[in-house]
């Protein structure tokens, strides 16, 4: 029996958020939605001395002419640019206004009506692609594999919400009646998704339907370079933003086959799992987190388990979620034998802020350490704490000049005051990403850490991410987190929590000496790096992020909060014990 898509996907449009659940029928809404053509409307203390100058993400060379044209057009006339992209989505009612600034939020495709389920499923069937494979379900956990066509998805996802608790699945499916797709306004909330909470309490991000559908459909080709029908795999948890955007909605909107993998990079059963899935299902592009690649490398440094698989259809590997250090990047290129492209985005944006837009001709061999160039629609800048633009390679606050493009969040659930305060008050006229980094002369962005993770060492602001990359480039360390430890003389000094790779026979004392020397050579004595402890594992969210704020509090003997998103909370106790022994 094939697994049901209903069992796998997140139910949206339910409860207080919106309309009744859209069900299915082969003829439901057929011919009602249409691609709307709308005539274009009117045009709509980081940093330091010596760093002030214009810094913006669209310039520089190496970007490809098509990318430059698209980026410039998206900023000069966003209404025309995104109105054109919206023609690729089917609308029940065309919008009356492409963009409306509501300070600080932005509304896109005002009064337009659509249904995202219709766009992701029904319209492909109406276009004669009902027998194409929509979902490949691969679960080493249950030893189940299945392919599900668009027609089968439609047939299986038409169960209305009903009160009750314990119900028999097959009985309910047998009784189910089909339901027409329900048109909703473009600004209608599609879902509430809570952030991973690595920088504080999780925040309920509210996602508008119309702009999200337009942006995701556009990114599948323009950012990720895929054609409809190709196999795409986002190796994420379905409950995180990558799962929502690029396991569920994005690939289905664009007509791609999406791989739904219920397993891990290691342990299900081994470090060859990713290679097996890529080969077996003919995956063209993979999106995963650097932490997954590090886990594979830690257990199988030579990728011996992956060598038995032929990856002839595999074209590109995309990574995001945590900064990808140069060592992990180069190892990935070597073992997967494809371009490996880091890019950067947030739960709040729902899609990439910066990337190598290979569908628009961006280079597939960008410099190591970067996270791409500004995606069209995102006017990324680097500012100091006084809102002065910084020169190339000066560390500062990464912000986005308003308006935000389609698909970005419209608010925080039941907390609009926090929405305004957290994201828009510090830098009026900009969206504050709360990340720190710099741009190079070519317009590539280097995201170094969260702003709170910049360590003040005797007046010098040092990026925790830069130290982490230096530590990880030493051949003995498989994973690392750097936090600031309070120091009576220097204010703070960096402390590294390190996980050694498998098979390292050198003593921890010797490794520590080598790491200190290595960091001193690569960053300089200004980092004042003198300390590291070795732990068996780092705490991470299920999306692969390290809760650095909690680790910082732990290291400094302060109360810390373990959020429900942490995969293994017991790791905190282990680190506490290691720190006690070290002191």
What are these regions (language model features)?
Residues 2-165, 579-583:
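N-lobe entry segment of adenylate-forming
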Residues 74, 121-125, 153, 157, ...:
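Adenylate-forming
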Residues 131-133, 160-194, 201, 211, ...:
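Conserved pre-ATP/AMP-binding loop-to-beta segment of ANL
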Residues 153, 189, 195-198, 220, ...:
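Conserved S/T- and glycine-rich ATP-binding loop of Class I adenylate-forming
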Residues 155-167, 228-229, 254-257, 262-394, ...:
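Conserved adenylate-forming
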Residues 211, 216, 223-262:
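Conserved AMP-binding loop of ANL adenylate-forming enzymes
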Residues 279, 286, 400, 404-405, ...:
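AMP-binding/adenylate-forming catalytic core of the ANL superfamily
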Residues 386-387, 489, 495, 535-557:
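Flexible lysine-rich "adenylation lid" loop at the C-terminal edge of ANL adenylation domains
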């Amino acid at each position: 029996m094939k697994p049901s898509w209903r069992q796998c996907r997140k139910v949206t449009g339910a409860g207080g958020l919106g309309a009744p659940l859209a069900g299915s029928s082969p003829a439901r809404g057929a011919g009602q939605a249409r691609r709307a053509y709308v005539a274009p409307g009117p045009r709509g203390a980081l940093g330091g001395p010596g760093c002030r100058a214009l810094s913006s993400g669209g310039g520089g060379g190496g970007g490809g002419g098509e990318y430059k044209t698209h980026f410039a057009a998206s900023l000069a006339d966003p209404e025309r640019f995104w109105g054109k992209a919206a023609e690729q989505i089917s609308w029940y009612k065309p919008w009356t206004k492409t963009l409306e600034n509501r300070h600080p939020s932005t509304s896109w495709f005002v009064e337009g009506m659509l249904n995202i389920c219709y766009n992701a499923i029904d319209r492909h069937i109406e276009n004669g692609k009902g027998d194409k494979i929509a979902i490949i379900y691969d679960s080493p956990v249950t030893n189940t594999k299945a392919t599900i066509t668009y027609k089968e998805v439609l047939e299986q996802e038409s169960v209305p919400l009903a009160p009750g608790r314990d119900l028999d699945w097959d009985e309910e499916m047998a009784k189910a009646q089909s339901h027409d797709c329900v048109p909703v306004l473009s600004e209608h909330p599609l879902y509430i998704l809570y952030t991973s909470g690595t920088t504080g309490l999780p925040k309920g991000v509210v996602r508008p339907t119309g702009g999200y559908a337009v942006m995701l459909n556009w990114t599948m080709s323009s950012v990720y370079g895929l054609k409809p029908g190709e196999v795409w795999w986002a190796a994420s948890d379905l409950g995180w933003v990558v799962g929502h955007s690029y396991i569920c909605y994005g690939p289905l909107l664009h007509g791609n086959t999406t791989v739904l993998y219920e397993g891990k990079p290691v342990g299900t059963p081994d470090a060859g799992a990713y290679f097996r899935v890529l080969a077996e299902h003919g995956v063209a592009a993979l999106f995963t987190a650097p932490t997954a690649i590090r886990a594979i490398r830690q257990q199988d440094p030579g990728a011996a388990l992956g060598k038995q698989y032929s990856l002839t259809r595999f074209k590109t590997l995309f990574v995001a979620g945590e900064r990808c250090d140069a060592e992990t990047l180069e190892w990935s290129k070597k073992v997967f034998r494809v371009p490996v492209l880091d890019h950067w985005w947030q739960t709040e944006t729902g899609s990439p802020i910066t990337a190598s837009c290979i569908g628009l001709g961006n280079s597939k061999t960008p410099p190591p350490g970067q996270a791409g160039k500004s995606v069209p629609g995102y006017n990324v800048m680097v500012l100091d704490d006084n809102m002065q633009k910084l020169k190339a390679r000066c560390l500062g606050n990464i912000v986005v000049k308003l308006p935000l493009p389609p698909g970005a969040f419209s608010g925080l659930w039941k907390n609009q005051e926090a929405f305004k305060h957290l994201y828009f008050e510090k830098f009026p006229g900009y969206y504050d990403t709360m990340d720190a980094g710099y741009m190079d002369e070519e317009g590539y962005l280097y995201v170094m850490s969260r702003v709170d993770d910049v360590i003040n060492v005797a007046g010098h602001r040092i990026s925790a991410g830069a130290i982490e990359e230096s530590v990880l480039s030493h051949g003995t360390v498989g994973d690392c987190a750097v936090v600031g430890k309070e120091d009576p003389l220097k204010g703070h000094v960096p402390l590294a929590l390190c996980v050694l790779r498998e098979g390292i026979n050198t003593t921890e004392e010797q490794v520590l000496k080598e790491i200190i020397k290595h960091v001193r050579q690569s960053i300089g004595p200004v980092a004042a790096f003198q300390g590291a402890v070795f732990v068996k594992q780092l705490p991470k969210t299920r999306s692969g992020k390290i809760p650095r704020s909690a680790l910082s509090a732990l290291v400094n003997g302060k109360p810390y909060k373990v959020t429900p998103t942490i995969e293994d909370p017991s790791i905190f106790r282990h680190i506490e014990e290691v720190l006690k022994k070290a002191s």
